[in-house]
Regions:
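Extracellular beta-sheet/turn segments enriched in Thr/Pro/Gly and aliphatic residues
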Residues: 200-219
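A general sequence property marking short-to-moderate contiguous segments
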Residues: 30-37, 41-43, 62-127
Length: 219
């Protein structure tokens, strides 16, 4: 096999090792996640109280295990984030948690095919001084028939995760050499069902660019 021109970190995270959290373990994770939610800066926005937490498959990267979470609030916002920890001889320790909120939810976006959340957890240094954002991605498919989800960078698969209770978690490099992650949903027979970018283009920005181009053309 000849050398590749896409020298980038791939499949660096361990696949999920556990079932989705439940019982006392879920209670422990919930405590850390809710504490992170309390620390969110809302700029005086009333986001409400968190409801039931949906946990996502665990993934382990560079010695830390990440368990993402999502919860809807009483005001219709969505809390999203993760709890991470190290595995010591006595069990999980060194817990950390992050959380944020959004008003952009799947219920209000019928054109979405995948409901995605993401957070950068590390940096990978590549060739010629370039670096990639090691990104935790989690979500749910909004179309039926899926079995596995992949993360692709410039059409190169860099991670994958089988659906677990219709949920998935990925850890993959993003924003490397002007290439950006695309998340794809695949069926059991290997057929592509859906694809979504982590980046949503703003229609207003597109209109502004088009307007500027029109002005330049007139000049």
């Amino acid at each position: 096999m000849p050398p590749t021109d896409r020298f980038v970190i791939s499949f660096a995270a361990e696949p999920p090792q556990e079932t989705l959290p439940y019982g006392r373990w879920a209670d422990t994770l919930r405590e850390h996640f809710l504490y992170a939610c309390q620390e969110i800066e809302t700029d005086d926005e009333e986001i409400g109280e968190p409801g039931e937490i949906a946990w996502f498959p665990d993934r382990t990267y560079a010695g830390r295990t990440y368990v993402p979470a999502v919860a809807r609030t009483t005001e219709g916002y969505e809390l999203f984030g993760f709890v991470s920890f190290s595995e010591g001889s006595g069990g999980p320790n060194d817990f950390e948690a992050r959380a944020d909120f959004t008003s952009e939810i799947a219920d209000n976006n019928p054109d979405w095919k995948l409901d995605l959340n993401d957070d950068v957890i590390a940096t990978w240094r590549g060739e010629q001084g370039k670096s990639a954002d090691i990104t935790l991605v989690w979500g749910v498919p909004l179309l039926a028939g899926g079995a596995i989800v992949t993360a692709e960078l410039a059409n190169l698969a860099v991670d994958q995760c089988e659906l677990l209770d219709e949920r998935f978690t990925l850890i993959a490099p993003d924003n490397y050499r002007s290439d950006f992650l695309e998340v794809k949903l695949w069926g059991k027979r290997g057929e592509e069902i859906a694809a979504e970018s982590l980046y949503v283009e703003d229609d207003e920005d597109e209109d502004a660019v088009a307007g500027d181009a029109a002005v330049e053309a007139e000049e």
